[in-house]
Amino acid sequence: MGAMAYPLLLCLLLAQLGLGAVGASRDPQGRPDSPRERTPKGKPHAQQPGRASASDSSAPWSRSTDGTILAQKLAEEVPMDVASYLYTGDSHQLKRANCSGRYELAGLPGKWPALASAHPSLHRALDTLTHATNFLNVMLQSNKSREQNLQDDLDWYQALVWSLLEGEPSISRAAITFSTDSLSAPAPQVFLQATREESRILLQDLSSSAPHLANATLETEWFHGLRRKWRPHLHRRGPNQGPRGLGHSWRRKDGLGGDKSHFKWSPPYLECENGSYKPGWLVTLSSAIYGLQPNLVPEFRGVMKVDINLQKVDIDQCSSDGWFSGTHKCHLNNSECMPIKGLGFVLGAYECICKAGFYHPGVLPVNNFRRRGPDQHISGSTKDVSEEAYVCLPCREGCPFCADDSPCFVQEDKYLRLAIISFQALCMLLDFVSMLVVYHFRKAKSIRASGLILLETILFGSLLLYFPVVILYFEPSTFRCILLRWARLLGFATVYGTVTLKLHRVLKVFLSRTAQRIPYMTGGRVMRMLAVILLVVFWFLIGWTSSVCQNLEKQISLIGQGKTSDHLIFNMCLIDRWDYMTAVAEFLFLLWGVYLCYAVRTVPSAFHEPRYMAVAVHNELIISAIFHTIRFVLASRLQSDWMLMLYFAHTHLTVTVTIGLLLIPKFSHSSNNPRDDIATEAYEDELDMGRSGSYLNSSINSAWSEHSLDPEDIRDELKKLYAQLEIYKRKKMITNNPHLQKKRCSKKGLGRSIMRRITEIPETVSRQCSKEDKEGADHGTAKGTALIRKNPPESSGNTGKSKEETLKNRVFSLKKSHSTYDHVRDQTEESSSLPTESQEEETTENSTLESLSGKKLTQKLKEDSEAESTESVPLVCKSASAHNLSSEKKTGHPRTSMLQKSLSVIASAKEKTLGLAGKTQTAGVEERTKSQKPLPKDKETNRNHSNSDNTETKDPAPQNSNPAEEPRKPQKSGIMKQQRVNPTTANSDLNPGTTQMKDNFDIGEVCPWEVYDLTPGPVPSESKVQKHVSIVASEMEKNPTFSLKEKSHHKPKAAEVCQQSNQKRIDKAEVCLWESQGQSILEDEKLLISKTPVLPERAKEENGGQPRAANVCAGQSEELPPKAVASKTENENLNQIGHQEKKTSSSEENVRGSYNSSNNFQQPLTSRAEVCPWEFETPAQPNAGRSVALPASSALSANKIAGPRKEEIWDSFKV
């Protein structure tokens, strides 16, 4: 029966142990532990291993005190081989040590009992022992008979011990001691042991050797410790619980001995076997076995123990519980301890990881300290095995992580940045000073040509473009990154927006191919267009700033970190898609500027500003493209110093160059003269164009300002324009004067044939006459007078030839419209002229006052000036204000090109000259006396004709320039090259001696039909008949003493001339009736001119004046009105002349005797007027719409002098 019960009991026991182990493994999750299990002895031991943190430290540089004690004990008490094995786990070191018994690590710091619940690898062994102990206690307490039959139940106990090793692989040995006696027995009666040897379990019955357990040693402490510790404190409430109650208690593990606090843990130890330590650290876990006395009081019966192998159990020195807990040497303020798993039962299995901002000063490139592994050997003294104290050093400022003492952030070059910001501040200061300088010289022509407001706007925008360098000098922040975009975009829009709009204005004004007038783009209009551009930029910047603020609310920062190739960190403003959009917008805007530069490439300018602006735009386009490419591609790798230098170079290569291109030429040209050809210079600012009432946008202006056109095309266009103007002039003339419609005569063919015969005179005659004029001008005063008296026919013959040559040139000249040319020159320009020119300009003032009193100039003045005015057609027809400004400060030699003037200036000039004429008439003899002295120069009268005055007055005085010198003077080679007039031919009628004689005759008496051409209507008023022409200077102002000397010779001749004119007055009135309309004007003019002194050199041409006048009159046949109207007008003029002649008879009688030699030439002229009266007719034209084109040659003076002389010649005929 017993043999059959043994296997059955063994199966039940194994089943119970297996269920107990499984339940133990599930118990921590299935149900909570009892209060005694959670807090045994009032100390918590159920904590999981964790990291030591800085909060555990009590001092800033604190480290574990237990670690220091452990290190001291290991160095002092533990043998070196044992300590080396404890640190490395190397068994070779341990085998060399000798021993006589086992070695325990007793007295070392750490909470030893707590390891059972703390270390997870020991939980299974503890649970197995607990279930086995509880099972045995239940069996002994439920059946008292088991205690009496120990020998019979040995198989049960051996099966129980074997099941412990079989159920838990970490248990290397299990033993059980049992005694029927209580504490009185010194040694147990039964001692059974099971040992694991490699892959098999060895059962041993050591009952015979049990008495040695009676001695209390380290090996028997597991037995004596529990026996001494036993105290009967467990009592049952009821004696008769029965098997049901015991089973319930067993399931709840609250039976006798079921509490884990009744287990005993031994220190880790090494077994000594055969005089040497056996490798592998062991720990003994023992538990007491209890039985019941007859009074149901628990009684100690034995001990069950297991030896657990710790070689695979890790030591957690970072934990607060367990063996060697808290014995790490990490400084908790700058590092933290991290255990290393899987190394086994060795010390130093942890890492001291440096916290953020600290680094380990070791040679390893990691921020931790790792203890020596188990494969490393330790040699030397005991100090080598002691754990070292490691300190993590702080990183450089601003580094969150570092591996050594090297800086992690880019180190800025302070001296370089200081030099850059200093130079930038200097440039900004110079820019501000430039604004003040430009405002100071705001009245200068170079500044006004560009516009003061526009230049100041460009300089202010440049100041904004200088700010990005200043912003990048400081550490990046959100505000500075936003300000960087604002300064860049606003500055770019201001500077290059203004430059582009200036180019746009040049394109609209100077290259307009339409004849319609468009509003001129003034500086105010350009500023309004710039305001629109800036408004768009403002709207974009406000939207971008709003998006940035919204991103900041979403924790999206505008500041980022870049890393260089050396792994150095630097802060930077992040580049987003908005930056790409702004770069593309700048590029497109500059492309528009490049197009405008190409469009205005042919436009001339006073200071070449469009050319410099084109260079600035192209420079900005190229440099900005390179800058944005580098910025977008290499921004994350360019440190702050490189980025600062990149912005610095971009700023000065674009902004500084732009300022230099716009300002340096203006101030460099201020000391030098601009180009001489001011007519081709195009000014871009207003230049008082609004007040002058003229805008430079007509078809002629646009055609002449574009050099790409063919001159032949321009000539054809001008011819068409002149024809249209002529048709419009005649239409307006007929509308205002209906009676002129009947004056068109069909006999114009006769006049044309006569003109054709006159123009067949060869040109050699005019050249010969010009040479004789030059020779005659070089003689002295007395000799010149003698030659005049001896050879009057020869000089008159030469004069006739030269007059015919002049008419020939005039016929073949281009028929021009009556456009008004500017003839005034600035005072400063006169000062730079030749000495003779300045003297002639002074005399021109006096001559102008005398001629204005007559209210008319001769038709000869218009015809002769037309012949050469074609050479002075400017390439750009500018307004009067523009001409005045362009020649205001010019000091170079005068140009021969004439400048057109608007009607508003002509009207103002008429009013001024009429007022001067009135003063001249009332002044009388006193005014003529003052005319011999230098008069103050009029800025509006002598501005543009100093050169012409010099040419025309060369005949009266020897010191003046000769006719041969005139071709060497610079002349404007205009587009009308075929109509150029020979200067010698044009001046051939002004030989020495002839000019003085012409001044003493009234042109109304010699050629009254020429005077009628200047008369607009039947009753011309002073406001209509006054022409806006400049008059040549007289010889009186140059040689006053000489002219007074010749007065006595002039007066008798003038008197004879007046006598002859009285005889022919009635006949002339019958033939030329139309001259009576303007007779009042001729009388006043004759009164002043007849009293003008005559120079001796001019006496040579007395006899030649009448035929030449006749020839000139023959050339006017194309514009003669019908004969009937001419006769009526002539009678009226003759009546008025007769009335006026009574008042001036005294002066005429003095002059009459000196011109007797010219009476032979009077009769042919009178006969011609009687036979061909239609040739002396001319249509009346309103002077308000006409003006005389005055070239810069000698034709101006010739026409001016010829008028009064012809009038006195006619008086001499009548006398």
From Swiss-Prot:
A motif (VCPWE motif 2) lies at residues 1071-1075. There is a cross-link at residue 774 (Glycyl lysine isopeptide (Lys-Gly) (interchain with G-Cter in ubiquitin)). Keywords: Cell membrane, Cell projection, Disulfide bond, G-protein coupled receptor, Glycoprotein, Isopeptide bond, Membrane, Nucleus, Phosphoprotein, Postsynaptic cell membrane, Receptor, Repeat, Signal, Synapse, Transducer, Transmembrane, Transmembrane helix, Ubl conjugation. The chain crosses the membrane at residues 418-439, 452-474, 479-501, 526-547, 577-597, 612-633, 643-664. Changing residue 502 to E: Does not affect G protein alpha subunit activation. It is a multi-pass membrane protein. Residues 28-40, 769-781, 819-828, 925-943, 1139-1151 have a biased composition (Basic and acidic residues). PANTHER family: G-PROTEIN COUPLED RECEPTOR 158-RELATED (PTHR32546:SF11). Homodimer. Associates with the RGS7-GNB5 complex, promoting its localization to the cell membrane and regulating its GTPase activator activity. Interacts (via VCPWE motifs) with GNAO1. Interacts with GPC4. Interacts with EGFLAM. This is Metabotropic glycine receptor. It comes from Homo sapiens.
